[in-house]
Amino acid sequence: MTLQCTKSAGHWKIVVWDEEGFQGRRHEFTAECPSVLELGFETVRSLKVLSGAWVGFEHAGFQGQQYVLERGEYPSWDAWSGNTAYPADRLTSFRPVACANHRDSRLTIFEQENFLGKKGELSDDYPSLQAMGWDGNEVGSFHVHSGAWVCSQFPGYRGFQYVLECDHHSGDYKHFREWGSHAQTFQVQSVRRIQQ
């Protein structure tokens, strides 16, 4: 069954199941889904991203921990939450990442909130910001010039994930509270571009 939701259909397609291993009831989406609970699912247990990049959320309404979902198969919840610091076995809402463009992505990171202090320009993946010369383990604010990025709490793309997009907040993320409802710290130690 293909469901059309509020955003216009693009080149995104995701199929979700209510049981692990691509078993049980399934639904196919080409646009955002604010709550699988409304479909009778308790949570998504497995999924396949057929096209586009998506971000999944722990709770309905695009709240809670964020999980980047790129093209591929995810037979169980640990396949998409394996590198997070506090894996949650719930995924109840998801949406496409419209501006993901791996080839043309640019991000400015700032030492302090509100775009103050030392800054760094990024256009590549960095498994360790400290290895590239960034002092400390915190980033105060971000400006996304183009593309979409996932920032991780720890080196090696581990820990909480924060999805930053050029078409959200006009690309401006002045404070960690704008990174997502689960963000509680400025700690960011690795950054990568989201693949379309």
From Swiss-Prot:
Gene responsible for this protein: CRYBA4
Entry's free-text remark on domains: Has a two-domain beta-structure, folded into four very similar Greek key motifs.
Region (Connecting peptide) residue ranges read 99-104
Pfam families listed in its UniProt record: Crystall (PF00030)
The record's keywords, sorted A to Z, are: Acetylation, Eye lens protein, Repeat
Please list the residues that carry the modification N-acetylthreonine.
2
Q: Into which family does the record put it?
A: Belongs to the beta/gamma-crystallin family.
Recorded source organism is Canis lupus familiaris (Dog)
Q: What does this protein do?
A: Crystallins are the dominant structural components of the vertebrate eye lens.
According to its UniProt entry, the protein's GO biological process terms are: lens development in camera-type eye; visual perception
In its UniProt entry, what is this protein called?
A: Beta-crystallin A4
PROSITE patterns reported in the protein's UniProt record:
CRYSTALLIN_BETA_GAMMA (PS50915)
Q: Region annotation N-terminal arm: residue ranges? A: 2-11
Q: Which terms in the Gene Ontology molecular function aspect does this entry carry?
A: structural constituent of eye lens
